[in-house]
Design a protein with these regions (language model features):
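N-terminal glycine/serine-rich phosphate-binding loop of ATP-dependent small-molecule kinases
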Residues: 1-97, 125, 153, 203, ...
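Gly/Ser/Thr-rich active-site cleft segment
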Residues: 9-11, 22, 88, 123-216
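Acidic-glycine-rich active-site phosphate/pyrophosphate-binding loop
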Residues: 27-30, 109, 212-216
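A charged helix-plus-loop insertion that forms the helical arch/lid used to bind
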Residues: 93-106, 181
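Short alpha-helix plus adjacent loop in nuclease-associated cores
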Residues: 102-117
Length: 216
């Protein structure tokens, strides 16, 4: 019999499940972690400990609980909080803590700057989203302005699911739905684009685009 394993990494906890071919649950596990608040308005995770560490721990716990041969796991699904902003090196290793989704408001000044430069209505029309603390683009600009050494050293800027999938497969990939939060450099129907902001980041430093149903 073959099995499917799924893990979801959340703000304060990660959880996993293994199901058989009929959808019957054969194992579950979870693991808590902390959200770091190093400064007011900031919210961070430690990717190696909180994301990958949880993933490995939960997989091991569920395999031990079920007694399943790991080779019988035919499909792995990874879901994680997002959109987050994480600079990584060429090997996919984190260069800093990850700035989390909308609960992290460090880029408020950068949102105002991009709105003034590009135009709020233009961004909304082209991207389908206004710039908010949920947007990754302003946080990339924040990183470039406030942590230039880390920005320059980063081979890629990724989000949480990309980080985990790269650990599993070696592929640096992001699904279109997550990438849509990278405004103003992801446009509706176009993907990565410098049409609104050409000098924010080189596009070879962003993950390859794919659909959430693609196998990588």
């Amino acid at each position: 019999m073959s099995y499917t394993l799924g893990i979801d990494i959340g703000t304060f906890e990660s959880k996993g499940v293994i199901v058989d071919g009929d959808g019957k649950v054969v194992a579950t596990a979870s693991r808590p972690h902390k959200m770091l608040v190093p400064r007011p308005g900031w919210a961070e995770h430690r990717p190696k400990q909180d994301w990958w560490g949880d993933f490995v721990h939960i997989c091991q716990a569920m395999l031990a609980q079920s007694g399943i041969d790991p080779k019988a796991i035919r499909c792995v699904g990874a879901s994680a909080i997002g959109p987050c902003m994480l600079p990584v090196d060429a090997n996919g290793e984190a260069l800093s803590n990850a700035a989390l989704y909308g609960v992290d408001a460090r880029a408020a000044v950068e949102i105002e700057e991009l709105d003034a430069e590009i135009g709020r209505e233009r961004i909304l029309a082209a991207c389908g989203n206004a710039l908010t603390s949920q947007s990754v683009g302003p946080k990339i600009l924040w990183l470039r302005k406030n942590r230039p050494q880390i920005f320059d050293a980063a081979a890629k800027i990724v989000t949480s699911t990309t980080y985990v999938v790269q650990k599993l497969t070696g592929e640096c990939v992001i699904d279109h739905y997550s990438a849509a939060n990278f405004s103003p450099v992801y446009l509706i129907g176009k993907g990565w684009s410098g049409e609104l902001k050409s000098d924010l980041i080189d596009f070879d430093r962003l993950p390859r685009l794919a659909w959430s149903t693609d196998i990588v």
